[in-house]
Amino acid sequence: MKIYLVGGAVRDALLGLPVKDKDWVVVGATPQEMLDAGYQQVGRDFPVFLHPQTHEEYALARTERKSGSGYTGFTCYAAPDVTLEADLQRRDLTINALARDDDGQIIDPYHGRRDLEARLLRHVSPAFGEDPLRVLRVARFAARYAHLSFRIADETLSLMRDMTAAGELEHLTPERVWKETENALTTRNPQVYFQVLRDCGALRVLFPEIDALFGVPAPAKWHPEIDTGVHTLMTLSMAAMLSPQLDVRFATLCHDLGKGLTPKNLWPRHHGHGPAGVKLVEQLCQRLRVPNDLRDLAKLVAEYHDLIHTFPILQPKTIVKLFDAIDAWRKPQRVEQIALTSEADVRGRTGFEASDYPQGRWLREAWQVAQAVSTKEVVEAGFKGIEIREELTKRRIAAVANWKEKRCPNPAS
């Protein structure tokens, strides 16, 4: 029995990055030998065991053979005669097909170290094409390591295009697509994930609402980058700089979906694209089974982001109505989330990346003022039932009006 550290832990250690999870491969052992050594079996489809002390995963070396469609159509063979090299060959990328033995020696049969140094994401073997999930995984790795200047090898991108054209991605379940997307959205450069999917044709298959934005022009006066798809990825990049929150990043990604519905004869203007986009956000979220809290914020951002940009000319009554509409009284975090997505929208434009966004500050300040109005004082003043809400609204509007006159006067007045 020989044990090797494999995959991501070896890769990240060689890159000088923190190692989070450790995976191990056991060569030359049977399931019974693992059980006799105190390991606990957890794998249903193939033999995976938990270490009795560390609880890290130890998998018996195995090979895989394509036996059906999609990413689940594989037959696994795990036995003592499976070599380490055979186990590593079934992995997706050369940089993930690395192992380290007890002496610290690196086993690298597929030149993963060379590709690490060259900053290349390259598939191990033609078997890559048998698993459509790998298209999304490569896109996610490209996003994860973009700050280290990794790029996808030409032959790997070509294979990803072939897989997409062959309809392989249609076998992916919504849950798997969303899981990879969720992980990609939490990387330092989530926009790279969607750019890679577009480069290989997968964006049109998996995210048609986003793909439809490319080639749709916006007024050059406001959008020097012109292309709405380009703007969308720029705003996502900016959102990633402004916030680590998945909610903020996903909502930013979806903020302009409505522009994809604008008839060509009305280009480059997109009046009413906010409310129009709400239906597309709902459609995308239902298809991919996106969690409700992310969906709800994304719909609000799609509908109201343009309103936030006009904050100086908004009436106090409109501002309080906005807080009602986003349910800020029960979910106060939404004020900050919407301020951040609106800022990402404005700064995600060519030449505006370093712009100030005072509207975000004003939104936060107005919220603090409105929130400070005391419900207790309204009740103690003798108001009852529906009168309480009406009086609260009246006092909130008055408080915001007083604040706005001093801090954010209407430029037209």
UniProtKB/Swiss-Prot annotation:
GO MF term (any one): phosphatase activity
Q: Cofactor binding mode, per the note?
A: Magnesium is required for nucleotidyltransferase activity.
- Limits of the HD domain: 228-329
Protein's UniProt keywords contain Ion transport: no
Enumerate the UniProt keywords alphabetically.
ATP-binding, Hydrolase, Magnesium, Metal-binding, Multifunctional enzyme, Nickel, Nucleotide-binding, Nucleotidyltransferase, RNA repair, RNA-binding, Transferase, tRNA processing
Tell me the Pfam families matching this sequence: HD, PolyA_pol, PolyA_pol_RNAbd
Question: Which InterPro entries has this protein been placed in?
Answer: CCA_bact, HD/PDEase_dom, HD_domain, NT_sf, PolA_pol_head_dom, PolyA_RNA-bd, tRNA_CCA-adding_enzyme
* GO terms (BP aspect): RNA repair; tRNA 3'-terminal CCA addition
UniProt-listed PANTHER family: MULTIFUNCTIONAL CCA PROTEIN
Q: Which family does it belong to?
A: Belongs to the tRNA nucleotidyltransferase/poly(A) polymerase family. Bacterial CCA-adding enzyme type 1 subfamily.
**Name listed for the protein in its UniProt record:** Multifunctional CCA protein
The protein's organism comes out as Salmonella schwarzengrund (strain CVM19633)
Per UniProt, what is the name of the gene that codes for the protein in this document?
cca
